[in-house]
Amino acid sequence: MIPGEILPADGDIELNAGRATLTLSVTNTGDRPIQVGSHYHFAETNAALAFDRAAARGFRLNIAAGTAVRFEPGQARTVELVALAGARKVYGFNGDVMGAL
């Protein structure tokens, strides 16, 4: 082994395996583009995004870490969300939760 070498397991790595997912239709009703990062609590995104916020509580985008989805003005698109993991406590963002989900 070489120092720092990574030896991955054989096969594909499935992101967020075994976690609950949800598919929602989202529309940017604003006049500016809105970008949402991979780990942002989706229910607390920009108010110009129209979707079922109650259903999205406790979920984030089901995309690779460090990436984002951009919603152009007037654009409607379908997104897949994945349940937050760990202690399921949310702090910050828009301050709507500030604790356990």
From Swiss-Prot:
Annotated localization: Cytoplasm
Matches recorded under InterPro entries: Urease_beta-like, Urease_betasu_sf, Urease_subunit
Domain of life, per lineage: Bacteria
E.C. code: 3.5.1.5
Keywords assigned: Cytoplasm, Hydrolase
Catalyzed chemical reaction(s): urea + 2 H2O + H(+) = hydrogencarbonate + 2 NH4(+)
Keyword Metal-binding attached: no
Chief localization: cytoplasm
Example GO BP: urea catabolic process
GO CC terms, sorted: urease complex
GO MF assignments: urease activity
Pathway annotation: Nitrogen metabolism; urea degradation; CO(2) and NH(3) from urea (urease route): step 1/1
SUPFAM superfamilies xref list: Urease, beta-subunit
Subunit relationships: Heterotrimer of UreA (gamma), UreB (beta) and UreC (alpha) subunits. Three heterotrimers associate to form the active enzyme.
Family as reported in the entry's similarity comment: Belongs to the urease beta subunit family.
Protein name (Swiss-Prot/TrEMBL): Urease subunit beta
Source organism (scientific name): Azoarcus sp. (strain BH72)
Organism ancestry: Bacteria, Pseudomonadati, Pseudomonadota, Betaproteobacteria, Rhodocyclales
